[in-house]
Amino acid sequence: MEAKASARYIRVTPMKARRVVNLIRGQQANEALAILKFAPQAASEPVFKVLESAVANARQKADREGLAFKPEDLVVSAAFVDEGPTMKRFQPRAQGRAFRINKRTSHVTVVVATPEKEEVR
């Protein structure tokens, strides 16, 4: 079973958000939540919320389909960050000049899944 959650237009640069997402990819969901809770990066809070939402979506999906749900079985199967729109601002400088400031945004997507049981032959 697979569940997905995403957050769009997060005010964190994609490069900084990718550093956080790389920490949790492939981890168990409970471990990933613990890692994010204590990660010092500012991007860890929105990623934590997205991962919590993905776990909640998995619980809802399991209830709908009548499947047994154990949160400790979930694994972060995919996690990625895409670049959102950039807000452009101007910083006034001396002698009538202006420097452009790019305020970048991110779209964070996290997919959790229960690993498939491999058949032993």
Curated annotation (Swiss-Prot):
Transmembrane segments annotated in the record for this chain: none
One GO molecular function term of this record is: rRNA binding
**Organism domain of life:** Bacteria
Indicate whether Membrane appears among the record's keywords: no
Question: CDD domains attached here?
Answer: Ribosomal_L22
Identify the InterPro entries for this entry.
Ribosomal_uL22, Ribosomal_uL22_bac/chlpt-type, Ribosomal_uL22_bac/org-type, Ribosomal_uL22_CS, Ribosomal_uL22_sf
A GO CC term attached to the entry? cytosolic large ribosomal subunit
Entry-linked SUPFAM superfamilies: Ribosomal protein L22
Q: Name one Pfam family in it.
A: Ribosomal_L22
> Keyword set for this entry?
Ribonucleoprotein, Ribosomal protein, RNA-binding, rRNA-binding
User: Could you list the residue ranges forming a coiled coil in this record?
Assistant: none
Query: Which GO biological process entries does UniProt record here?
Result: translation
Subunit and interaction comment: Part of the 50S ribosomal subunit.
Q: Which family does it belong to?
A: Belongs to the universal ribosomal protein uL22 family.
Report the function annotation for this chain.
This protein binds specifically to 23S rRNA; its binding is stimulated by other ribosomal proteins, e.g. L4, L17, and L20. It is important during the early stages of 50S assembly. It makes multiple contacts with different domains of the 23S rRNA in the assembled 50S subunit and ribosome. The globular domain of the protein is located near the polypeptide exit tunnel on the outside of the subunit, while an extended beta-hairpin is found that lines the wall of the exit tunnel in the center of the 70S ribosome.
- This protein's name: Large ribosomal subunit protein uL22
Q: Which organism is it from?
A: Kocuria rhizophila (strain ATCC 9341 / DSM 348 / NBRC 103217 / DC2201)
Q: Which gene encodes it?
A: rplV
